[in-house]
Amino acid sequence: NMVLVSRDGQQWSPPPLASLEHRADLPHTGLAQVLTSAYNGADWRRNILWVKERFFVVFDEVQAREAGDYDLECLWRSLGRVSLSPTRFTVDQAGQDFSIEGTDGAACVVREQWEGQGSNYYASYPYSNDGLVKVLRQHRRLPLQAGQRAVFSNLLHTHEGAAPTLKAERVADNAMLISGASGKWLAGVGRIDLPGVLRTDAALWLVSDSD
């Protein structure tokens, strides 16, 4: 599960090391930001916001260090029966479902991938019907000047049955509204000004209408 970055048609391996920029482990939430620097002309920040026992929100920010035409892919790997709508990727593992819902408008496709050398590596996994890895590929291609950025924003959560129990809506490139029967949450990264609602420049932030 990662972001692939290429610039002007060239792609090199990601840097071998990443830095933990921020972390917090609170009673009801967890927050983390990891930075991969100088990755094919850009910096990649993975921001993870965790509402414990409920969901994860992941913002992947790619900020250009150098101007160029960027080709970006955010990859998510899973096992089981999958379905794909324009905004949601759902995995069924024997009645236990998992969804990834994007709010950034990236084009999405699912590819099947065989793992192992000459054998089905995941054939014995009890919650995979065929042993194939299903890879969700979220794709964006765009020109970026130095300092500009592109963001992949995704809500990840589990649910019993095919119908997701949460809904994600785009508020801004760096902010998402999550709604469910148990409440609403506003999650984001970096500076935002929502008149009458929220103004902050925190690296990662999360507010709710309950706890």
Feature locations, PLM:
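CBM-like, beta-strand-rich accessory domains located in the C-terminal region of large
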Residues: N1-D211
